[in-house]
């Protein structure tokens, strides 16, 4: 059977760690606090990524492991208990405290699960304490959200009520829009995970139909399935086509009339196609290489190829769950290479050999590639931007047309001359 060519490689990687997901999770749940147990490097990463002033009162922080902790000369558990209690006394509005593991805390085998259990016993339900790992050891940065949501699944109340559960963080306005559309189609009860208040957890059970909004929530989906929920497999809501198929998957699960679904979605798709037209004029025929970082790469590749007319040189992804991504793989062109994992030097060699018009990559690779004359798009920008849904299809396409327009304005042509020196990442 024809389809994309699935490949795999391993080696040195270039990705952020899962702590980065705290940046959007702490905004999603304003009554929660994320306490990273890690090093000063962890603290600097989150502070820089979130862009919060040092004198502000953010809803995240770092319990910094000292040299004495790392050397085993101090009881890190006692110190962690003290820090948590001081934090909760100072910030009484906190309803849920996430203890977030890091590379350093995992290296010294600090048992945050036991710490959370101990604190829950002492706090007697006043504050819920949960833990998950944001370590970058063998993970990529979006998996931090998967870890956080997976930690909440055992806490969800049980209910067999018929409902649609949207799983994965969306911008509030985008989520409101999707819920409104589902209600117009005929689905009455719609909940979301993560909730907008950490204490307002949705129920789950045999009547729950789960629709993932993000492709990196593998563990969360598995645990929800274990709780009796039905997890749908569908393309993800990026672009007009993917978003429509995503919504139609829910409509089919709830046995909604095709005519009613079409009446809601047809006008939206028509407007989206009109918004896409001016960006397709820039993108059509251009060659794009997607390096692995966010796990959004397959849905993005499908959108860019089918709706924007781009040619896929290679589609990289940090991890590939073939069952969860089956609908996306079915929509990719035959024989396009899909590379799971990363050997960053080998991938950069393939980028240089293929000379694509645009490369989607991490921030650390963007400047070296730009210096070699190759236009780039930061993959992390796609995670922080409101790009989901039919209404956002034009905005999503603009994120890719903009760097090509910029390069045309800076200097003619997208490729360096043969005299340009190679800059190694």
UniProtKB/Swiss-Prot annotation:
InterPro entries the record matches: LIPOR_BchN/ChlN, Nase/OxRdtase_comp1, Protochl_reductN
Free-text comment on the cofactor: Binds 1 [4Fe-4S] cluster per heterodimer. The cluster is bound at the heterodimer interface by residues from both subunits.
EC number of the protein: 1.3.7.7
Cofactor entry: [4Fe-4S] cluster
Keyword annotations of the record: 4Fe-4S, ATP-binding, Chlorophyll biosynthesis, Iron, Iron-sulfur, Metal-binding, Nucleotide-binding, Oxidoreductase, Photosynthesis
An example Gene Ontology biological process: photosynthesis, dark reaction
Domain of life where this protein originates: Bacteria
Reactions that this protein is recorded to catalyse: chlorophyllide a + oxidized 2[4Fe-4S]-[ferredoxin] + 2 ADP + 2 phosphate = protochlorophyllide a + reduced 2[4Fe-4S]-[ferredoxin] + 2 ATP + 2 H2O
Enzyme class per UniProt: oxidoreductase
Biological pathway: Porphyrin-containing compound metabolism; chlorophyll biosynthesis (light-independent)
Binding-site residues, [4Fe-4S] cluster: 17, 42, 103
GO MF annotations, alphabetized: 4 iron, 4 sulfur cluster binding; ATP binding; metal ion binding; oxidoreductase activity, acting on iron-sulfur proteins as donors; oxidoreductase activity, acting on the CH-CH group of donors, iron-sulfur protein as acceptor
Pfam families in UniProt: Oxidored_nitro
Assembly and oligomerization: Protochlorophyllide reductase is composed of three subunits; ChlL, ChlN and ChlB. Forms a heterotetramer of two ChlB and two ChlN subunits.
PANTHER family reported for this sequence: LIGHT-INDEPENDENT PROTOCHLOROPHYLLIDE REDUCTASE SUBUNIT N
Similarity comment: family membership: Belongs to the BchN/ChlN family.
Functional note: Component of the dark-operative protochlorophyllide reductase (DPOR) that uses Mg-ATP and reduced ferredoxin to reduce ring D of protochlorophyllide (Pchlide) to form chlorophyllide a (Chlide). This reaction is light-independent. The NB-protein (ChlN-ChlB) is the catalytic component of the complex.
UniProt-recorded name of the protein: Light-independent protochlorophyllide reductase subunit N
Gene source species: Synechococcus sp. (strain CC9605)
């Amino acid at each position: 059977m024809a389809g994309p060519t699935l490949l795999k490689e391993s080696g040195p990687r270039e990705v952020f760690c899962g702590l980065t997901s705290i940046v959007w999770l702490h905004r999603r749940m304003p009554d929660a606090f994320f306490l990273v147990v890690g090093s000063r490097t962890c603290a600097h990463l989150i502070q820089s990524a979130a862009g919060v002033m040092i004198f502000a009162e953010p809803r995240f922080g770092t319990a910094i492991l000292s040299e004495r902790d790392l050397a085993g000369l101090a009881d890190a558990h006692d110190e962690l208990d003290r820090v948590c209690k001081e934090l909760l006394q100072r910030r009484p509005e906190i309803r849920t405290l996430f203890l977030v593991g890091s590379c350093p805390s995992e290296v010294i085998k600090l048992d945050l699960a036991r710490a959370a259990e101990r604190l829950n016993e002492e706090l007697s339900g006043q504050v819920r304490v949960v833990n998950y790992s944001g370590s970058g050891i063998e993970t990529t940065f979006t998996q931090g959200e998967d870890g956080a949501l997976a930690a909440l699944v055992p806490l969800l109340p049980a209910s067999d009520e018929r409902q649609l559960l949207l799983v994965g963080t969306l911008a509030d306005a985008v989520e409101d829009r999707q819920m409104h559309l589902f209600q117009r189609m005929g689905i009455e009860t719609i909940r979301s995970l993560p909730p907008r208040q950490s204490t307002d957890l949705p129920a789950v059970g045999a009547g729950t139909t789960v629709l993932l909004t993000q492709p990196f929530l593998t563990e969360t989906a598995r645990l929800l399935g274990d709780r009796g929920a039905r997890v749908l497999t569908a393309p993800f809501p990026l672009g007009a086509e993917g978003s429509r198929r995503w919504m139609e998957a829910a409509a089919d699960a709830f046995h909604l009339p095709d005519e009613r679904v079409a009446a809601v979605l047809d006008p939206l798709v028509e407007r989206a196609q009109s918004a896409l037209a001016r960006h397709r004029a820039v993108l059509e025929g251009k060659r794009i290489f997607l390096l692995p970082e966010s796990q959004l790469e397959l849905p993005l590749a499908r959108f860019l190829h089918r709706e924007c007319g781009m040619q896929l040189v290679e589609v990289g992804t940090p991890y590939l769950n073939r069952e969860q991504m089956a609908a996306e793989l079915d929509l990719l062109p035959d024989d396009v290479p899909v590379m799971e994992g990363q050997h960053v030097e080998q991938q950069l060699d393939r980028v240089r050999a293929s000379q694509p018009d645009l490369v989607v990559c991490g921030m650390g690779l963007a400047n070296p590639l730009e210096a070699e004359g190759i236009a780039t798009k930061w993959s992390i920008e796609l995670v922080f931007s409101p790009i989901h849904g039919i209404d956002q299809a034009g905005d999503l396409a603009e994120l890719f047309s903009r760097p090509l327009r910029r390069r045309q304005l800076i200097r003619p042509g997208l490729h360096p001359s043969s005299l340009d020196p190679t800059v190694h990442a």
